[in-house]
């Protein structure tokens, strides 16, 4: 994971140089890349506290830029008509004879934290809830199960929860010249974090997942900053 991530960052740096990126942008790309890789290196050396501290400092560096941190209803992670109510969905898999109640569709209670899994943004032992903005998104995330095993429910959020935006797409890259400098630099920082947190773990039964180190550290950093979650 670390070596592959380094290769991806090298590609980003080379592409930025080739496109004539300014010195400040190059400094952001190199600086953020090096610090994320350093965080991984420290984690592998069992210096977990300092590894997490590096990611926390990166989140603090991004600050309160509204492109990066905003309420659910105003976040750039969910483009569209702001006057319409945002709808989210939550799904669970279960046999046809299992009738899920409303309380079954929220996250595990803290009394059952021993059953919480090790997922991308889930801190082990701390139940969390994954939502999609469509039932189709839920179906994809649960592995495209048979309809008879798929249970989905709408979830209505108050909308004032502050979330960290990792829903960054390369399609935005074409529009960077239209943005002000501050937003371009914010986009670059978020993009480098997005690369580190977007790996797919192909081995289902693997206990330790290096690919989730930065993701889970980022979630802990967001909790310390008082954010309600991460959009990705």
Task: Specify the residue positions occupied by each region the protein language model found.
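Short glycine-enriched loop/turn motifs at secondary-structure junctions
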Residues: 120-126
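Short, well-ordered beta-strand elements within core beta-sheets of diverse protein domains
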Residues: 126-132
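Active-site and NAD+-binding cores of ADP-ribose-processing enzymes
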Residues: 1-85, 90-95, 100-114, 118, ...
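Short active-site loop/helix that positions an aromatic residue
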Residues: 135-146
